[in-house]
């Protein structure tokens, strides 16, 4: 990840994509916004050449910094899909201290702990703790609800 964007570049990219910073790392949504923004800022459509080049440059650098996704990077959905309703969090106390391993929160946290010890990046690790660290949020109900919405819209490999 040696071409990773700085915080200012990430904020600039999200501004150009017209997306809130909370959606940084939601790559399918960012891709759609990028394609839409390219049509708007393209010089042939009345946009600025500098703005178009900046958008493409930032987005290309972001894509280059993404790790290659393999089947090992995904949780196994056959275990999750056996449950009709996915439990995001079984019990806050049990999930934080005993690791119930039944809810999605614990499965992602266990995946976080089992990965190699290099620095974790939101988008590579989808656990709640990486989410709040990456976005600089305080652990609270609003942050948890926001994380759940992003996880619900994230496609997982089956």
Curated annotation (Swiss-Prot):
Gene3D superfamilies: DnaJ domain, Small t-antigen, unique domain
Zinc finger (H1C3-type): 112-130
GO molecular function: zinc ion binding
Main location, first listed in the record: host cell
C4-type zinc finger span: 95-106
SUPFAM superfamilies per UniProt: Chaperone J-domain, T-antigen specific domain-like
Alphabetical list of InterPro entries matching this protein: DnaJ_domain (IPR001623), J_dom_sf (IPR036869), Papo_T_antigen (IPR003354), Papo_T_antigensf (IPR036092)
Residues carrying N-acetylmethionine: 1
Compartment(s): Host cytoplasm; Host nucleus
Alphabetic keyword roster: Acetylation, Activator, Early protein, Host cytoplasm, Host nucleus, Host-virus interaction, Metal-binding, Oncogene, Phosphoprotein, Transcription, Transcription regulation, Zinc, Zinc-finger
GO-annotated cellular components: host cell cytoplasm; host cell nucleus
Keyword Transcription regulation in record: yes
Every J domain range: 12-75
Pfam family, one: Papo_T_antigen
Annotated function: Promotes efficient viral genome replication by accelerating both G1 and S phase progression of the cell cycle. Inhibits host PP2A by binding to the A subunit, thereby displacing lower affinity regulatory B subunit. Inactivation of PP2A in turn results in the transactivation of cyclin A and cyclin D1 promoters. Late during the infection cycle, ST may induce dephosphorylation of host MTOR, leading to the inhibition of cap-dependent translation. May establish and maintain high levels of viral genomes during persistent infection in cell culture.
Domain observations: The common region of ST and LT proteins comprises the J domain. This domain is essential for multiple viral activities, including virion assembly, viral DNA replication, transformation and transcriptional activation. This domain is also required for cyclin A-transactivating activity of ST.
Quaternary context: Interacts with host PPP2R1A; the interaction inhibits PP2A activity.
UniProt name for this protein: Small t antigen
Source organism phylogeny: Viruses, Monodnaviria, Shotokuvirae, Cossaviricota, Papovaviricetes
């Amino acid at each position: 990840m040696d071409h990773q964007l700085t915080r200012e570049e990430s904020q600039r990219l999200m501004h150009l994509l017209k997306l809130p910073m909370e959606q940084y790392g939601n790559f399918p949504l960012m891709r759609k916004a990028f394609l839409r923004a390219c049509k708007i800022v393209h010089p042939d459509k009345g946009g600025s050449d500098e703005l178009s080049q900046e958008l493409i440059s930032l987005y290309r650098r972001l894509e280059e910094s993404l790790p290659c996704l393999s089947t090992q990077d995904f949780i196994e959905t056959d275990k999750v899909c056996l449950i009709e309703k996915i439990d995001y969090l079984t019990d806050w106390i049990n999930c934080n201290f005993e690791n119930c391993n039944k809810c999605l929160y614990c499965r992602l946290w266990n995946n976080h702990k089992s990965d190699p010890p290099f620095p974790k990046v939101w988008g590579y690790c989808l656990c709640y703790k990486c989410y709040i660290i990456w976005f600089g949020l305080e652990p609270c109900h609003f942050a948890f609800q926001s994380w759940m919405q992003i996880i619900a819209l994230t496609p997982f490999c089956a």
